[in-house]
C-alpha cells in the first residue's frame, strides 16, 4: 500500500513537472485570490486596531482611564499568546524562517493551526502599538494558505512547495502592494534561482493578491512620496557611495542585535522567574512610556516614514527617534509575539537616510527639495544589507513609493551596502534566524520529492558521475535547448540547462548548496 502511494506521488510530481503554463497560472490565481482576502483583511484589521490603540495614547485628557484599558488589553494579549504559542510554536516571530524551512524540506507546518492562530494573535500583537511589522506574518499566512490549497487539490510534494512559495509571495504582495518584490523575495531569499516549477504560479499569485489588496485599500502606494523629487547630479554621486557604506555597517549592527535579543529575554526571564511563554509582558510594560510621550512613533513604522517627508525634523529629533525605535524594535521582536522586522527595518532605514539627508542639507551639499530621496535610499540600502536581498530591496521600495526614477541611486546605495555587509561576514538575517531555530524544527522523515534547479557554473561542463552526489540523490532528466532527455552517468551538464532531481526533502538545502 505504501509502495503504491509512493508510485502515485511520483507520477503526480512528474505530471506537474510537465504541466502547461496555463495550468500553473490557474493554480497561482487560486492562491492569489485566497491569500489576497486573508492578508487584505489581516492588514485592514491591524490598521483599524492600531489607530484605536494610538488614539487611546493620544487622548491625554482621559489618560488614566485609557491606560487602564490598554493595560487590560495587553494582559489579555499576553495570556492568549501564552496559550496559543504553547499549542503552536511556529506562529512566533515573523514566520519567514519557518516558511524557508518548509520549502527546504526541513519542517512541515500544520497549515490550518498556523493560519488561524497567527491571524488572530498577529492582529492583536501588531495592532497593540509594539514596533512589529505585518509583512513577515503576511508571508507566513500566505504560505499557509498556499499549503491549504495544495492539500485540497491533493497535490504532490513538488507542487505543494510551488503553491507554498506562491502563497508566500502573494502575502508580501498584498501586504505592501508590491507584486514583483513578492516574486523576487522568494527567488532571492528562499530558492536562490529561477525555476519554472514555481515562478509562473508565484507571479500570477502575487499579481492577483495585489489586485485584491488594491480593491480594499485603493491605488495609492503604501509609502506615497512627494512627486517630482529633483534628481541629484552625477557630481553628487559620491554621497551615495558614502551612504551605502554607512548603511552597510548599520545593517551589520542591527543583525547582531536582533539575533541576540532572545538571549537577553532568556536571561531576564530566569532572573525574575517568568516562563518564556509570558515574555511578551516585558515588551508591553516597556512600550507604555513610549506610547504616552511619543505615540506618533508607535507601530510598524509606516507613519514614521511618511512623516519624514511631510515635516521638518532636526538632527537631534531624528537621532532620538532612531535610537528609540531601534531599541524598542528589538524589545518587541524578542518577545516572541507574532510580528515581523520587515517594516521596522524599513522605518529604521528611512531614519538613517533622513539623518544623512539633514547633514547634507545643512552642509549645502544638496537642496531641501532633494531630501526625500535620502529617505527612500535609506530604506533600500538598510533592508538590502540586512536581508542580503538587494534586488528585492530595490524593487520593493520602488513599488512602495510608486516612483521608478530613482532606480540608479537605489541600485548604487543598495549594492554598496550589500558589499559592506558581505565583507563584514554578515549573513542574510532570515537564514541566520533559520539556523538558530533548526535544532528545534529540523525533521527527516525520509520522504522523497522532485526538484528542478539550473546548471550553474559550478557544475557546467561536468559529467553526472563527476558531481559526487549523495547516494540518495538521483538526477532523472535534463532540459537542454527546450528538449527533455533522460540522464545517465556520462551525460554532460551545460550552463543554463535545467535538471530534475529525485531527492529526500530533508536534503534539498544541502544539495542546492552543493550544486548552485
Q: Which residues make up each language-model segment?
A:
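Alpha-helical transmembrane segments and immediately membrane-proximal extracytoplasmic
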Residues: 1-441, 447, 482-483, 496, ...
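Residues in well-ordered beta-strands of folded domains
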Residues: 100, 454, 476-479
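Short amphipathic
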Residues: 449-456
Amino acid at each position: 500500500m505504501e509502495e503504491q502511494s509512493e508510485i502515485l506521488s511520483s507520477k503526480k510530481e512528474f505530471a506537474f513537472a510537465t504541466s502547461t503554463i496555463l495550468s500553473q497560472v490557474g493554480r497561482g490565481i487560486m492562491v492569489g485570490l485566497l491569500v489576497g482576502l486573508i492578508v487584505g483583511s489581516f492588514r485592514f484589521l491591524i490598521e483599524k486596531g492600531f489607530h484605536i490603540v494610538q488614539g487611546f495614547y493620544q487622548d491625554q485628557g482621559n489618560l488614566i482611564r485609557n491606560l487602564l484599558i490598554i493595560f487590560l488589553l495587553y494582559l489579555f494579549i499576553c495570556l492568549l499568546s501564552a496559550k496559543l504559542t504553547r499549542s503552536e510554536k511556529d506562529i512566533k516571530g515573523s514566520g519567514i524562517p519557518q516558511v524557508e524551512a518548509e520549502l527546504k524540506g526541513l519542517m512541515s507546518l500544520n497549515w490550518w493551526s498556523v493560519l488561524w492562530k497567527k491571524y488572530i494573535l498577529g492582529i492583536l500583537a501588531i495592532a497593540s502599538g509594539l514596533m512589529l511589522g505585518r509583512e513577515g506574518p503576511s508571508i507566513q499566512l500566505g504560505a499557509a494558505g498556499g499549503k491549504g490549497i495544495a492539500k485540497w487539490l491533493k497535490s504532490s510534494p513538488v507542487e505543494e512547495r510551488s503553491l507554498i512559495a506562491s502563497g508566500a509571495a502573494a502575502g508580501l504582495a498584498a501586504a505592501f502592494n508590491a507584486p514583483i518584490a513578492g516574486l523576487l523575495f522568494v527567488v532571492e531569499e528562499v530558492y536562490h534561482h529561477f525555476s519554472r516549477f514555481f515562478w509562473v504560479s508565484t507571479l500570477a499569485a502575487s499579481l492577483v493578491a495585489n489586485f485584491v489588496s488594491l480593491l480594499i485599500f485603493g491605488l495609492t502606494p503604501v509609502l506615497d512620496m512627494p512627486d517630482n523629487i529633483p534628481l541629484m547630479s552625477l557630481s553628487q554621486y559620491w554621497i551615495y557611495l558614502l551612504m551605502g557604506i554607512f548603511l552597510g555597517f548599520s545593517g551589520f549592527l542591527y543583525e547582531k542585535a536582533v539575533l541576540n535579543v532572545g538571549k537577553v529575554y532568556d536571561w531576564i526571564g530566569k532572573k525574575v522567574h517568568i516562563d518564556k511563554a509570558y515574555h511578551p509582558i516585558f515588551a508591553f510594560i516597556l512600550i507604555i512610556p513610549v506610547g504616552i510621550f511619543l505615540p506618533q512613533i508607535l507601530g510598524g513604522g509606516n507613519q514614521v516614514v511618511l512623516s519624514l517627508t511631510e515635516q521638518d525634523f532636526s538632527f537631534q529629533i531624528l537621532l532620538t527617534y532612531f535610537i528609540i525605535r531601534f531599541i524598542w524594535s528589538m524589545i518587541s521582536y524578542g518577545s516572541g509575539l507574532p510580528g515581523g522586522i520587515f517594516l521596522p527595518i524599513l522605518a529604521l532605514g528611512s531614519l538613517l537616510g533622513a539623518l544623512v539627508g539633514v547633514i547634507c542639507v545643512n552642509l549645502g551639499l544638496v537642496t531641501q527639495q532633494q531630501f526625500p530621496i535620502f529617505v527612500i535610499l535609506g530604506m533600500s540600502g538598510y533592508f538590502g544589507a540586512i536581508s542580503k536581498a538587494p534586488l528585492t530591496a530595490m524593487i520593493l521600495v520602488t513599488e512602495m513609493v510608486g516612483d521608478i526614477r530613482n532606480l540608479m541611486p537605489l541600485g548604487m546605495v543598495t549594492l554598496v551596502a550589500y558589499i559592506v555587509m558581505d565583507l563584514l561576514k554578515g549573513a542574510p538575517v532570515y537564514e541566520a534566524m533559520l539556523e538558530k531555530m533548526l535544532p528545534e524544527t529540523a525533521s527527516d522523515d525520509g520522504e522523497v520529492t522532485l526538484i528542478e534547479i539550473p546548471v550553474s557554473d559550478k557544475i557546467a561542463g561536468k559529467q553526472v558521475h563527476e558531481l559526487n552526489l549523495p547516494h540518495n540523490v538521483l538526477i532523472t532528466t535534463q532540459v537542454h535547448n527546450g528538449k527533455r532527455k533522460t540522464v545517465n552517468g556520462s551525460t554532460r551538464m551545460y550552463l543554463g540547462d535545467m535538471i530534475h532531481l529525485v531527492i529526500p526533502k530533508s536534503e534539498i538545502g544541502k544539495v542546492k548548496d552543493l550544486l548552485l
